[in-house]
């Protein structure tokens, strides 16, 4: 249970999750430099160059589990080809994905072309101070990141809020410019009263 609540950083809750990460990803913990900041994690993977370092980030905490659940909210059950539980989509899936990718690359002896940082806050769900503490640590080290990849996006295949079929969520935040081409086909209508099937 890694739920977080407004204005309360319950670091002890996350220590168990950190142990699971150590067991599942031994090479990450052996080969990368780990810094723990009040339950928040920062890993440093030395690359061939320190120019243009990148940061992969996501959060460990989840919102409280309320209501009825098909599977226990903290079970991580695998059923019907899916992982069920809090954090399966928001967003321990990202944490596990980047740890798994790095673990496999380390096993192959891969050295990234530039320095890579992995960061995971434990207070994101209530806008806490986890990410700012990680930023402060990076600033203390004099790190100027070239690219930050945070949670979000992806192709959603499950119905959400009455939307059926596959759809992609695109989120961009940068200084500069991004060109996105988007095509939707539908009968005309007005945004205030969209007809059924409007993309």
Protein language model annotation of sequence segments:
Residues 42, 179-183:
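Beta-strand secondary-structure signal
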Residues 38, 51, 71, 113, ...:
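Short, solvent-exposed loop/turn segments at the edges of secondary structure
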Residues 2-86, 107-112:
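Acidic/His- and Gly-rich active-site-bordering loop/insert found
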Residues 1-4, 184-188:
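Short, histidine-centered active-site or binding-site loop motifs used for metal coordination
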Residues 132-137, 191-199:
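A short core secondary-structure module
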Residues 163-166, 185-192:
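Flexible glycine/proline-enriched surface loops and loop-helix/loop-strand junctions
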Residues 57-59, 120, 149-151, 183-185:
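Short beta-strand segments
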Residues 83, 89-169:
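Acidic/histidine-rich catalytic neighborhood of metal-dependent amide-processing enzymes
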